[in-house]
Swiss-Prot record:
Protein name per the record: 4-hydroxy-3-methylbut-2-en-1-yl diphosphate synthase (flavodoxin)
Gene3D superfamilies, per database record: Dihydropteroate synthase-like, Sulfite Reductase Hemoprotein, domain 1
Cofactor binding summary note: Binds 1 [4Fe-4S] cluster.
InterPro entries listed in its UniProt record: Dihydropteroate_synth-like_sf, IspG_bac, IspG_bac-typ, NO2/SO3_Rdtase_4Fe4S_sf
Family of this protein: Belongs to the IspG family.
Cross-referenced Pfam families: GcpE
Length: 353
């Protein structure tokens, strides 16, 4: 299939063993919602994120105890860790001493140039990148006054001012995020930023909301930018289990053909032609397919109109009949299956592929 999306070429940086930017695959990030000082709970959550396919995880660093906990956490997990730092540059230093893979901070918020130079110097020495993260709710007062409130242009100016502070101390291992809770403002800000710099962009919609509404806002905002070639790593922000962020993030990438792994499920919305309980069948099959390590396309169709004809590009699928379904592969009908056996039989067929 022709690649319809041409990604912007950005500078490539390395976070642990993951590359961001350039021709690197778009990575999916999350953030723990445990107290980082609770090492056991934090490790448990990170392992759940690893299992879900998370590439990079960020942790809140509230104090020195949280910073030193990074060292113990690193011993038990595989994915790169990002320290989320606000105001106190000493916490960034302590995290780097304990092996963190990346720092998220805004240099304008940690004090004078000496402090910026200290953090940037240590990060450069250890090969640790820094992400500048501008959010609409934390734009500097002078910029708010200049632009008359929060604007995409103001957020970009803020981000580039922080970038300049790092560049002025000869640090260029930088990623940038520039998020708003407003989807249109987020899109406008990233579009503008992508025209002004070549640093890799961490894309997301901040404070997106609960799982349902946040998924929609994130899919629209992140999806729009990725479709334009903007974005090198993504984070879906949801009020809920961080594992859900990974599921949504990966599905956004799959929807744009930017991630080609795992089972892709296509299913019809059903209509009056459907003679089997396709909704229950689809809902029963989906979680079972998530456990199978296959790179295939599975079609779950309600009738012979939608499948196998319209779904003939699927590797395998079913099409509803009267109290039974047709099993097909690449558009070719294999056999009929009673409705009550369809889930078991389809999973068995897929497992053997």
């Amino acid at each position: 299939m022709e690649d319809c999306i041409k990604r912007n070429q950005t500078k490539k940086i390395k976070v642990g063993d993951i590359f961001i930017g350039g021709d690197s695959p778009i990575s999916v990030q999350s953030m723990t919602n445990t107290d980082t000082r609770d090492v056991k709970a934090t490790i448990h959550q990170i392992k759940s994120l690893e299992e879900a396919g998370c590439d990079i995880v960020r942790l809140a660093i509230l104090d020195n105890e949280a910073a030193t906990a990074i060292g113990e956490i690193k011993k038990h997990v595989k994915i790169p860790l990002v320290a989320d730092i606000h105001y106190d540059y000493r916490l960034a230093v302590e995290c780097m001493k304990n092996g963190v893979d990346k720092i998220r901070l805004n240099p304008g918020n940690i004090g004078g140039n000496d402090r910026v130079r200290t953090v940037a110097g240590m990060a450069k020495e250890r090969g640790i990148p820094i992400r500048i993260g501008v959010n609409s709710g934390s734009v500097e007062k002078r910029i708010l006054e200049k632009f008359g409130g929060v604007t995409a242009e103001g957020m970009v100016e803020s981000a580039l001012a922080h970038v300049a502070m790092l560049e002025n101390v000869d640090f260029n291992d930088i990623a940038i995020s520039i998020k708003a809770s407003s989807v249109p403002m987020t899109i406008a800000a990233y579009r503008l930023l992508s025209e002004k710099c070549l640093y890799p962009l961490h894309v997301g919609v901040t404070e997106a909301g609960t799982v349902y509404k946040g998924t929609i806002k994130s899919a629209v905002g992140i999806g729009c930018l990725l479709a334009e070639g903007i974005g090198d790593t993504i984070r879906v922000s949801l009020t809920g289990d961080p594992v859900e962020e990974i599921k949504v993030g990966k599905q956004i990438l799959k929807s744009l053909d930017l991630l080609k792994e795992g089972i892709e499920i296509v299913s019809c919305p059903t209509c009056g032609r459907t003679q089997v309980n396709l909704i229950d069948i689809a809902n029963s099959i989906e979680p079972l397919l998530e456990k199978l390590n296959k790179n295939i396309k599975v079609a779950i169709m309600g009738c012979a109109v939608n499948g196998p004809g319209e779904a003939k590009d699927a590797d395998i699928g079913i099409a509803g009949g009267v109290n039974e379904v047709l099993l097909f592969k690449k558009g070719r009908i294999i056999r009929k299956i009673p409705q009550e056996n369809v889930v078991e039989e389809l999973i068995k067929e897929i497992s053997e592929m």
